[in-house]
Regions:
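Pre-Walker A-like glycine/lysine-rich segment at the N-terminus of P-loop NTPase domains
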Residues: 1-47
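Phosphate-coordinating catalytic segments in nucleotide- and nucleic-acid-processing enzymes
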Residues: 47-174
Length: 174
């Protein structure tokens, strides 16, 4: 289980260390980095699913889309290296670092060789973030839109959920 997540130079996170529990609720004002916490994990997951994590980070699709390296890099970053460090609360720590400085216009950031401690592929596959049992709950911003159609959340084989119409009603309460 993921117990700590360090995010360095990613979006609004210059250097953040977050302790995670069995249930973690992220709250805060707009723009403080709540979404970026989830996006950090989803970027690692989607790069792994795309068989590209050992080479770098896919910034777009299928789980989330950030844009380019310039969109991902924190505007106050002292250098162009984006890092994510995952800890299990015991001894296992995985550090993933990516070179955003040389990929500002790219949607794929190459692995930063000098500052990463990538586990082997077998260890990655056994980790909850990269296993076939991975699940998460995401939120969409409806922005005050009125939704009168019915939808249904349907799981796909990769652990993500998709909306299917005509099953569940969503109502905007004024």
């Amino acid at each position: 289980m993921i117990r700590t997540l360090e995010i360095v130079n990613f979006k609004s996170h210059l250097a953040s260390k977050i302790r995670l529990g069995d249930l973690t609720v992220l709250t805060g004002v707009n723009g403080c980095g709540k979404t970026a916490v989830t996006q950090a994990l989803l970027l690692l997951r989607q790069s792994f699913v795309n068989n590209r994590l050992m080479a770098g980070l896919d910034l777009n699709r299928p789980l989330c889309s950030i844009g380019t390296g310039q969109d991902a890099l924190c505007r106050w970053a002292p250098n162009g290296i984006i890092s994510f460090v995952i800890g299990d609360g015991q001894d296992e720590i995985m550090k993933f670092s990516f070179d955003a400085e040389n990929g500002l216009d790219d949607s794929f950031l190459k692995k930063h060789e000098e500052d990463s401690s990538y586990p082997d592929s077998e260890t990655l596959t056994a980790h909850p973030l990269f296993s076939t049992g991975f699940q998460y709950i995401g939120a969409s911003r409806w922005g005050g839109a009125v939704c009168s159609r019915k939808i249904h959340l349907q799981s796909s084989n990769n652990g993500s959920c998709h909306y299917r119409r005509d099953r569940v009603s969503l109502w905007r309460i004024s």
